[in-house]
UniProtKB/Swiss-Prot annotation:
InterPro entries: CheY-like_superfamily (IPR011006), Sig_transdc_resp-reg_receiver (IPR001789), TCS_response_regulator (IPR052893). SMART domains: REC (SM00448). PROSITE patterns: RESPONSE_REGULATORY. Keywords: Phosphoprotein, Transcription, Transcription regulation, Two-component regulatory system. Disulfide bonds: none annotated. The modification 4-aspartylphosphate is found at residue 75. The lineage of its organism: Archaea, Methanobacteriati, Methanobacteriota, Stenosarchaea group, Methanomicrobia. It comes from Methanothrix harundinacea (strain 6Ac) (Methanosaeta harundinacea). SUPFAM superfamilies: CheY-like. Phosphorylated by FilI. This is Probable methanogenesis regulatory protein FilR2. Induction: Transcriptionally regulated by FilR1.
């Protein structure tokens, strides 16, 4: 597996399970990807640093012919287009709305929480401060969303 620091970097493996990670903080993104790797995730993580890049990526893949992500990990405080707008556009799209979106943010604001759920977020989690706590959070995300949860996937 390889790590990079540029928008559009990919953590690749053979399993077709794709997670779209939308995170502008390099350190947070690296820790999240490292936690998935240490937990034995064998899919692919596609990391984008801003909301516009995420929407462009999803629009490109939405048309068919390319694999859509099976889960989106979304920060709210993003450059260019904020996470709330990314979430709103995902959930308004007939083809994308079934993709689980997990907000992973530092925001503890009740307004952000209410707004995310009004836009049909699947889960809202606060980023832990330590790597060990983040690793536990990622482990729980992986166990629930990639293990127990069943979803129909994109339309």
């Amino acid at each position: 597996m390889s790590y990079g620091l540029d928008s559009g970097d990919v953590l690749e493996a053979e399993d077709p399970f794709i997670i779209l990670l939308v995170e502008d903080n390099n350190a947070h993104a690296m820790l999240i990807m490292r936690a998935f790797e240490r937990l034995g995730f064998t899919g692919r993580i596609e990391w984008l640093r801003d909301g516009k890049a995420a929407l462009d990526y999803l629009r490109l893949h939405e048309g068919g012919g390319r694999s859509l992500p099976r889960m989106v990990l979304l920060d709210l405080r993003l450059p260019k287009v904020d996470g709330h707008e990314v979430l709103s556009q995902i959930k308004r799209s007939e083809r994308l709305r079934a993709i689980p979106v997990v907000v992973l943010t530092t925001s503890t604001s009740d307004d952000d929480l209410r707004r995310a759920y009004s836009n049909h977020v699947n889960s809202y989690l606060i980023k832990p401060l330590s790597f060990e706590d983040l690793k536990r959070t990622v482990e729980e995300i992986k166990e629930y969303w990639l293990g127990w949860n069943r979803s129909p996937g994109p339309a």
